[in-house]
Each structure stands twice: as C-alpha cells, then as structure tokens.
C-alpha cells in the first residue's frame, strides 16, 4: 500500500518529490487483486454487513466496504505523472502476492522520468533477503548521490 499512498502524494507535492523507489508495489490492489477475485458470496457480505474477514494463510484480515470504496476514489493507474525524476521499481520474480506487471504499470504512469525496473530473480514479495536488501540499499545510495 506504500507505493499507492506515495503515488497519490504527487497530487500535492509534485515539485518537492525528487525520486521514487517502489518495492513490490501494488497500487489499486484492493480492486484488482481482491475485489475482482472475491466470490459473489463474499462481495455480498461486504456490501450488506460492511465487512468480511478474509482468511489468507494463517491470518484473517478484516476487509471493509469503506476501504474498497476509498480505493476506488484514489486510483493512480489512469493518471500520468510528468515529473522529471528518477524512478526505480524493485519486484521479486517469485512474488506470489503481487504480479510483476503492477510494478511495470507503475513505471508507465511516469511520462518524463528516468525509469528503471529491477526484477530480483529469487525474490518474494517482501524482498527481505540479504541480496534484495543490498540491491535496494545500493539504489538508495545512487539516488542520494544523484539527487542531493
């Protein structure tokens, strides 16, 4: 959800934002990865009760109708960001939560940016292994040296 929130910040802070790094980004996931895949029974429950508890692995998550509606009000894929900044997207090739196509779609939102896509071969959604973290830290250094 972090990249989604950050992309929406361009509405207010476009001139202050100097770079963008996304990690396993999933803007609009509420609609595209959840709502569209929910069975009709779950959608009906969410609409009628305002909430449903969705089990995923060992966890249960409350999904409210309000958050689905809020997600619809904050779409970013249909907008363009014309900032001349550096943008790097990191995504794990073995991410089972979010398809790599989401990070590629985020790149397409930036029309004038210097863009880079880094797909980490054995990376999962968290990109929390040592190799992934080192690649991200190296990119942060590059940003710091380029932007500051």
Predicted regions located by residue number:
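N-terminal glycine-rich phosphate/adenylate-binding segment common to multiple enzyme folds
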Residues: 1-4, 25
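Short glycine-enriched nucleophile-adjacent loop
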Residues: 3-14, 20
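The alpha/beta-hydrolase serine catalytic core
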Residues: 16-88, 92-114, 119, 124-137, ...
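Alpha/beta-hydrolase-fold serine-hydrolase catalytic core, especially in secreted/extracellular enzymes
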Residues: 145-148
């Amino acid at each position: 959800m972090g990249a989604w929130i950050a992309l929406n910040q361009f509405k207010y802070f476009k001139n202050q934002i100097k770079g963008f790094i996304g990690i396993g980004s999933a803007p609009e996931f509420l609609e595209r990865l959840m709502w569209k895949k929910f069975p009709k029974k779950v959608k009906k429950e969410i609409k009628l009760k305002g909430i449903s508890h969705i089990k995923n692995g060992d966890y249960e998550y409350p999904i409210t109708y309000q958050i689905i509606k809020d997600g619809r009000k904050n779409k970013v894929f249909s907008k363009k960001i014309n900032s001349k900044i550096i943008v790097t997207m990191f995504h794990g090739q073995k991410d089972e939560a979010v398809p790599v196509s989401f990070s590629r779609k985020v790149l397409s939102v930036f029309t004038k940016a210097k863009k880079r896509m880094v797909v980490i071969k054995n990376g999962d959604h968290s990109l929390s292994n040592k190799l992934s973290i080192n690649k991200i830290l190296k990119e942060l250094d590059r940003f710091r040296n380029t932007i500051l």
